[in-house]
């Protein structure tokens, strides 16, 4: 069983130059505004208020760092979780979205301590072009020592037939209803396995 036994807010950064010096392996959470990044992070670390959601989606431009200790058996594994700004919010200007995109790509390319990208996708809207573009972008810039996984959120909003279809379509993805321990446990297991470079 994998648990997160310690978690705390580390720092926020609005530019690559403000990010903390690399110390531990990092897991980056990326996705559209309102997809549930903060909620998923809080569920993973079992803390309701660690990652804060903005009251105005798409407003926050900060890269937020969280320091965590994961436990598997007697092994304690330090990881940093990185919550990136949400993208694609309609009320943000095109110029601002472009600027954010360029900053994020630069960040993802230059941050050598990133070991895993976690892209969150709303299960109700699995075919949005902006999500496909983000997936392709990550695939284009990731290094050989990095991995990337999809996590479909809000699965509880689908009927069982649509849930099954989505799971069959993306057999390597993780699925969570943003509720319930089973889905979150599977995400924890996958995250740790991929960060450590372990086989399935």
From Swiss-Prot:
GO BP: any one term: division septum assembly
Family per similarity comment: Belongs to the TRAFAC class TrmE-Era-EngA-EngB-Septin-like GTPase superfamily. EngB GTPase family.
Gene Ontology CC annotations of this record: cytosol
UniProt KW keywords: Cell cycle, Cell division, GTP-binding, Magnesium, Metal-binding, Nucleotide-binding, Septation
Role played: Necessary for normal cell division and for the maintenance of normal septation.
UniProt gene name: engB
CDD domains: YihA_EngB
Sites where the protein binds GTP: 31-38, 58-62, 83-86, 153-156, 175-177
Domain of life according to the entry: Bacteria
Annotated protein name in UniProt: Probable GTP-binding protein EngB
Database matches in SUPFAM superfamilies: P-loop containing nucleoside triphosphate hydrolases (SSF52540)
Cofactor(s) of this protein: Mg(2+)
Binding annotation for Mg(2+): 38, 60
One Gene Ontology MF term: GTP binding
Domain (EngB-type G): residue spans on this chain: 23-197
